[in-house]
Amino acid sequence: MRRDIVAIAGVELELFEAGNGPPILFLHGAGGFVPEHPYVAPLSARHRLIAPSHPGFGKSSLPEWIDAIDDIAYIHLELLERVGLDQVDVIGCSIGGWVATELATKAPKSVRRLVLVGPVGVKTGPVDRLDVPDIFALPQSALEKLLFHDPERMTLDPTRLTDEQLAIMVRNRETLALLAWEPYMHNPKLPHRLHRVTAPTLFLRGESDGLVSAQYLAAYARLLPNARTETIAAAGHAPHIEQPDAFARTVLKFLDAGAV
């Protein structure tokens, strides 16, 4: 895994790359990109995996002008130009799925196939009720029960983290609040743009996801012209982390089905 810092539009963007072959742009969720996670190896075995840390996450800088998820999509589009790619497959997890849909509405021809894993980004329910539980108001123990199929196995022990890792965790959470607090976890304009997405799209959800419900996912998928949904068993909001083998198999099968 290669790590670099790339300067784009005033952002010092942390960038991870691995493998060779058809390119995949991987857009991480609120926890950031962790190159040691087991799903990374199968994705990069036959593909070129390009995984930036969003501005304000990991070790990427966050200039003052970036104050919305929509802004991040433009940064990643410029990244694709910088690395010389006209078209990529895109995988987006949670808020990374939101970034991915924003990106796909702005440059439909740049996205060959799209995978959205427990994505947020749209409002599908009544205006007076949250579609996604308020993660900023929940105690950590309650949040972990919503995030994971098996919280006891997946919960991080903070005493085993380095000071740098703890600082990144705190920074990731602060950036998430800045970008997704108001309006909460959605862009009111995005549903009116999703008809522009031309890529075949796979919506993935862990069966025990307590943040993104099956109803929300289905309603989200109906907003795109060519989308379908699948469920990964024994997984919560991050199936790529809880069930990396099943996740990689499902995603690669979908991507390979469209290979020329």
Model-assigned labels for residue ranges:
Residues 39, 199, 213-222:
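Short alpha-helix in the alpha/beta-hydrolase fold that links the catalytic acid
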Residues 98-106, 112-142:
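Flexible "cap/lid" loop of the alpha/beta hydrolase fold
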Residues 197, 203-205:
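Short beta-strand/loop motif that positions the catalytic acidic residue
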Residues 8, 50-91, 241, 249-252:
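Active-site loop/oxyanion-hole signature of alpha/beta-hydrolase fold enzymes
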Residues 208-212:
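Acidic catalytic loop of the alpha/beta-hydrolase fold
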Residues 125-130, 140-198:
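Conserved alpha/beta-hydrolase catalytic His-Asp/Glu region
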Residues 9-61:
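Conserved HGGG/HGGXW glycine-rich cap/lid loop of the alpha/beta-hydrolase fold
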Residues 227-260:
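Catalytic active-site module of serine/aspartate enzymes centered on a nucleophile-bearing elbow/loop
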